[in-house]
UniProtKB/Swiss-Prot annotation:
Pfam families: GARS_A, GARS_C, GARS_N. Binds 1 Mg(2+) or Mn(2+) ion per subunit. One of its GO terms (biological process) is 'de novo' IMP biosynthetic process. The keyword Transmembrane helix does not apply. ATP binds at residues 137-192. SUPFAM superfamilies: Glutathione synthetase ATP-binding domain-like, PreATP-grasp domain, Rudiment single hybrid motif. It is an enzyme of class 6 (ligase). The gene is purD. This is Phosphoribosylamine--glycine ligase.
Length: 421
C-alpha cells in the first residue's frame, strides 16, 4: 500500500513508525511533516494539512491507496470528505462525524440520546449579559469546569476552584467568538481509551492515561499533553469493556442513527468515578501523546488495521495482539510552553531510536532546532512500568535544548500505588 499520513507531530511520527513495519506498506509519505521524518517517509512540507483540495491533489498525485489523518483540524475542515469524494480510502471521520470533538454541545446531545454518563452542562453563547454569565457560573462549582466549545488543541479547558479564574476564562472564550460550556466536575482518575470505529463495529486499543498539566504534581496550566503511559495497572479488569459497552458502542450507534456514521478513531476521555466510567470529552482522532505509548505495544500490523477501518471491513479482522509490557511517553517542551513557546533553539543529542519528533525544523545551517511548543517525545518500553519509566528518562536527560522542560513524574502515581478507584 502507498500511504499518505497528514500531520506534523510526534503522533504522526509514531503512526509512520507503526506503518513502516507492516509488510503491506510499500511507500510512505507525510504532509507537512517535520525535520525528523525524512528517514522514514517522503516529506511534503508545502502542503497545508487543513486544505481539502491540496491534500486531495497530493493523494491523487501519489496514487495513494490510503490516507491517514492525524490531527483534528483537517478532520473538522472536511479533508476526509474531499478524499472520499475523490474515491480515496481514508482513515478519519467525515466533517459531520468530527463534530463529536469540534462541538462539545453536539457531543453532549449524542450522549444524552443514548443515556451515556457525562457531566451536567450548560452553554453560554457570545452576547450573553454579564448578569446571565454570573448566574450560570453560580449554578456550578465550587470546582468549575469551563470549556471552549470549539477546537483548542487540548488547551481550551480550565478546571479551577477559583470563581474569578472561571469567569475570566468564560470571558476570554466568548471574546474569541466561541460559545462556552460550563460543566459539573467529574471526580476520579482519567482514562484515555482509543477505539477503532467502523459504523457500529468498535474495537478498543489499550487504555492509557495522559498528563495534561505543564509541571510536576499536576501544577501549571493545561497543555496538549506532557506525557502518557499504557496500559493502566489500576483499571478494573472489566474497565475497558465497560467503557466500550457503556460509552463507545452507544455513541457509534447514535452516530449511525443520525446519518453521520463514524469511521476512524474515537477517543473517549473518561473519568472513572464511584459508579464507573463517565465521559469528560471525545476526540475524533488519535490522542497525542497517548498514541505514542499505545502504538509502541501493538503487535498487529497497523497498515492493514487502519485500511480495514477505511474500507469498512473492521469486523472481519482478527483480535488485536499486544506486547506483554508497558510503554511510557515523556514530552520535551520548549521554553515558556504553553504560554508563548520560544522556537529556534538548537537541539543536541536527540538521535536515539526512542526519540520521536514533534515541533522540530532545520535552520539555515542545517542544525536541528525547536519549531513548536512540544518539541520531542521520548518513548520507554519495559516489562514493568518502572522499567519503561527508566528507559524514557535515561534518554531524555541526555537531550540538550536551552530552556526546555519536561515532567519527571509521568506514571509515578500509578507506580507508587497512589491511584485508587
Amino acid at each position: 500500500m502507498r500511504i499518505l499520513v497528514i500531520g506534523s507531530g510526534a503522533r504522526e511520527h509514531a503512526l509512520l513508525r507503526g506503518l513502516s513495519t507492516d509488510p503491506a506498506t510499500t511507500e510512505l509519505h507525510v504532509a507537512p511533516g517535520n525535520a525528523g521524518l525524512g528517514s522514514i517517509a517522503t516529506v511534503h512540507p508545502g502542503i497545508k494539512a487543513d486544505d481539502p483540495e491540496a491534500v486531495t491533489a497530493l493523494a491523487k498525485e501519489l496514487n495513494s491507496d490510503l490516507v491517514v489523518i492525524g490531527p483534528e483540524i483537517p478532520l473538522v475542515a472536511g479533508v476526509a470528505d474531499a478524499l472520499r469524494a475523490a474515491g480515496i480510502a481514508v482513515f478519519g471521520p467525515n466533517k459531520d462525524a468530527a463534530r463529536i470533538e469540534g462541538s462539545k454541545a453536539f457531543a453532549k446531545d449524542v450522549m444524552a440520546a443514548q443515556g451515556v454518563r457525562t457531566a451536567h452542562a450548560e452553554a453560554i453563547t457570545p452576547g450573553a449579559s454579564s448578569e446571565d454569565i454570573d448566574a450560570a457560573i453560580d449554578r456550578f462549582g465550587p470546582t468549575w469546569v469551563v470549556k471552549d466549545d470549539g477546537l483548542a488543541a487540548g488547551k481550551g479547558v480550565v478546571v479551577t476552584p477559583d470563581r474569578a479564574a472561571a469567569r475570566a476564562h468564560v470571558d476570554a472564550v466568548l471574546e474569541g467568538g466561541n460559545p462556552v460550556l460550563l460543566e459539573s466536575f467529574l471526580d476520579g482518575p482519567e482514562v484515555s481509551l482509543f477505539c477503532l470505529v467502523d459504523g457500529e463495529t468498535v474495537v478498543p486499543l489499550l487504555p492509557a492515561q495522559d498528563h495534561k498539566r505543564a509541571y510536576d504534581n499536576d501544577e501549571g496550566p493545561n497543555t496538549g499533553g506532557m506525557g502518557a503511559y499504557a496500559p493502566l495497572p489500576w483499571l478494573p479488569e472489566d474497565g475497558v469493556q465497560r467503557i466500550v459497552d457503556e460509552v463507545c458502542v452507544p455513541v457509534a450507534r447514535e452516530m449511525v442513527a443520525r446519518g453521520c456514521a463514524y469511521s476512524g478513531l474515537l477517543y473517549a476521555g473518561i473519568a472513572w468515578g464511584a459508579e464507573g466510567p463517565a465521559v469528560v470529552e471525545f476526540n475524533c482522532r488519535f490522542g497525542d501523546p497517548e498514541t505514542q505509548a499505545v502504538l509502541a505495544l501493538l503487535k498487529t500490523p497497523l497498515a492493514v488495521l487502519l485500511n480495514a477501518v477505511a474500507t469498512g471491513t473492521l469486523a472481519e479482522q482478527p483480535a488485536l495482539e499486544w506486547e506483554d509490557a508497558y510503554a511510557l511517553t515523556v514530552v520535551l517542551a520548549s521554553y515558556n510552553y504553553p504560554e508563548a513557546p520560544r522556537t529556534g533553539d538548537v537541539i543536541r543529542n536527540a538521535d536515539a531510536d526512542n526519540v520521536l519528533h514533534a515541533g522540530t525544523a532545520l535552520n539555515a545551517e542545517g542544525e536541528l532546532v525547536s519549531a513548536g511548543g512540544r518539541v520531542l517525545n521520548v518513548i520507554g518500553v519495559g516489562e514493568t512500568l518502572e522499567a519503561a519509566r527508566d528507559n524514557a528518562y535515561t534518554t531524555i536527560k541526555d537531550i540538550e535544548l536551552e530552556g526546555s522542560h519536561y515532567r519527571s513524574d509521568i506514571a509515578l502515581a500509578a507506580l507508587e500505588g497512589r491511584i485508587s478507584i
